[in-house]
Amino acid sequence: MPSADKTALQVGDVTKRFGGLIAVQNLSFALAENEVLGLIGPNGSGKTTMMNLISGALRPTSGEIRLYGDDIAGVGASRIANKGIARTFQLVRMLPGLTVLENVSAGGVFGHTRRWGKELDDYAQALLQRVGLPNAGDVAVTALTYIDQKRVELARALASDPKVLLLDEWLAGLNPTELKTGIALIEQLRVEGRTIIIVEHVMHAIRSLCDRCIVMSSGVKIAEGTPREVLADAEVIRAYLGDADA
């Protein structure tokens, strides 16, 4: 359950401009510790840009982003990873020259909680077991299926023991069986109290996993509330879901 008295992440009036294009405009929200927050909206609404701002891949034009009170806006991706934010990507990003175990271990070396040697190997192997790849450690990541590469990317993000986990369309491109497995994996993280922001188009996942949702359209927040509340909102239906999905 979200912690009512602990704010993990605070986004205050964040704007990101690319020349004359405003990708995110005056966006504000708070993420409670142990909360799973859904960030939804149509393509091009600014969701992934917001994830890039939080993770340090982009610098805000204005506004502030605080992780447990520490200003992290624009300090850079490596420093933000060290401070405790880990992510997956819309398109899976593997380290192609490394094995599965080595990919996961990279998260433990460069992230928030650092491990080395046998401790790191054992921890990475335990994470592979957790995501359903107990025997894949020595396999080249390029030999894996798409869903298994996603599992590795999730394990690598978890290897840093992040304070906040960002999942950017982690369920995209999965078939129905893979989708069921993927939702179950994220549900395990939710049950154990992870603090997560999910960008997702799979509404079943949003309904079942998220405590609260923020809906973006054209770079601005148009709705905020529980999944049930925002998915019934008329403006959200017009902007994103369509009448058939109401």
Question: Across the structure, where does each feature detected by a protein language model lie?
Answer:
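Glycine-rich phosphate-binding loops of nucleotide-dependent enzymes
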Residues: 2-246
